[in-house]
Structure formats: C-alpha cells, structure tokens
C-alpha cells in the first residue's frame, strides 16, 4: 500500500501527469499505458461519482502510474468515501486558507489524528481487512494536495504551507486568472508572475508545487522553477483536437475553438 507518488514528491522527483475527464474506466486504462507518472481523476468538473472513480481506480491499478483524485469539494463525507474505495492521493479544490487546508488533512486521517470514519471491513482500500495493520499504516500513506485558485488563497499561501500533512500545493491557473480579472487568459503577464512566484515559494517551503498546463513551453518553464507534479494535457482536449485535425484533413470544418489552459 506504499504511496509511490507521495514518495516521489518527497524525494524531489518531478512527476508528469494527464487529466482524465471522460469518466470512463475503459479510456482510463487505455491512457494508463501511455507512460505518464500520474493520472488525475476529476470529480469537480467531470461527471464522476464514487462508483465511476472506483472503476477507474481498478482500471489503472495494474499499471505503474499513480491515480490522483479530485473531489468536487473539501467535504469530509465525500473524501471518506473516496478513500475507502482506494484513493491515496487527493487534490482538494478551492482551498482558501490554513483552516481549510487543515480540515482537508483531518478528513484523510483516522482518529486521533483526524476524523476519517473507520469502515475498513467494507473498504477496497484495506482489501477488506486483508492488509495487516491497515488502520495503523493508512495515515502515513495519504497524500494531500490542496488547490489555491484565488488572490485570497495566494495571500494566505505562507500559512497554508505551514499546515502539517499538506504534501503539495496545486495552482489552478484557470480560476486564478479569472479571479485576477483575466478570465480565459492565464498567460497574462500578471497571472504568470503570480504563478511563478508561488511555485518558487512552495518549493522553498519543502512542499511540492503542482499545476495543470497544456502549453509545452510553460510546462517546461514551471518544471525549471521547481514544480514537482505537472499535468501536461487533458484527455477530452486530446481527443477533440485529434478528431478535428483528422476531419480537417478531409475537408471538414470544426467549430472554432479558443485555446485555453487545458
């Protein structure tokens, strides 16, 4: 049950990932063989629930890449269910301050360190109580990544970084750019300056910085600055653009698409 993704971040080894939004175990397994270090199963903006997350975790399990799951909100009940089906690494969205970061950590820990309910006899995570001492080992293998996506969260970053149990901080460029007044333009110089400053600050604190960016040049720039988990594409975008390109080669006209962060 060792969390190799958490170990890689702790060792300072950059991890390259892909975002999964198709909500399909079939496509998740297909992409698990592509060679990425981690795959993000999105429960915030993709039509996922606990059952579809479970089937994708099962599909990815035979492969070396590590799944990361994003719940729809920083909700301890939802987090408990996601952990019980086997999630070890969580990306918690829209964390605004240290208190909210602390709540996210507590939701992943069994008492007395946290508030995670004990139901290991029913849980895939414990292999239905077949993992010896699961209740004693589970806390140490949980990896908590919190998402900062607003100016308020950026202002509170030093306090968020001080929260014990937060393994990494993920910068959400789409929401951050919107909050800064540049919706749809995460490459605006002011947004980029804020992102770069945050990456350096997070890395210097000893935590792992992360981001999603489909722009190859920017992805490499963030890695140079010290980002440790970088998602470089989204399955829905890859499929849509590849299909449009194929159709265009035979004269078809696709609906115009404005390039974005994804």
UniProtKB/Swiss-Prot annotation:
Domain of life from the UniProt record: Bacteria
GO biological process: 4-hydroxyphenylacetate catabolic process; phenylacetate catabolic process
Keywords, comma-separated and alphabetical: Aromatic hydrocarbons catabolism, Lyase, Metal-binding
Broadest EC class assigned to this enzyme: lyase
Pathway given in the UniProt record: Aromatic compound metabolism; 4-hydroxyphenylacetate degradation; pyruvate and succinate semialdehyde from 4-hydroxyphenylacetate: step 7/7
Site label Increases basicity of active site His, positions: 84
Manner of cofactor binding, per the entry note: Binds 1 divalent metal cation per subunit.
Binding positions for substrate per the UniProt entry: 147, 174-175
Signal peptide: none
E.C. numbers: 4.1.2.52
GO molecular function, a single term: metal ion binding
Amino-acid positions noted as binding a divalent metal cation in the UniProt annotation, renumbered to this chain: 149, 175
Cofactor: a divalent metal cation
A GO cellular-component term linked to this record: cytoplasm
Transmembrane portions of the chain: none
Catalytic reaction annotation: 4-hydroxy-2-oxoheptanedioate = succinate semialdehyde + pyruvate
Record-annotated site: Transition state stabilizer: 70
This protein's name: 4-hydroxy-2-oxo-heptane-1,7-dioate aldolase
Source organism: Shigella boydii serotype 18 (strain CDC 3083-94 / BS512)
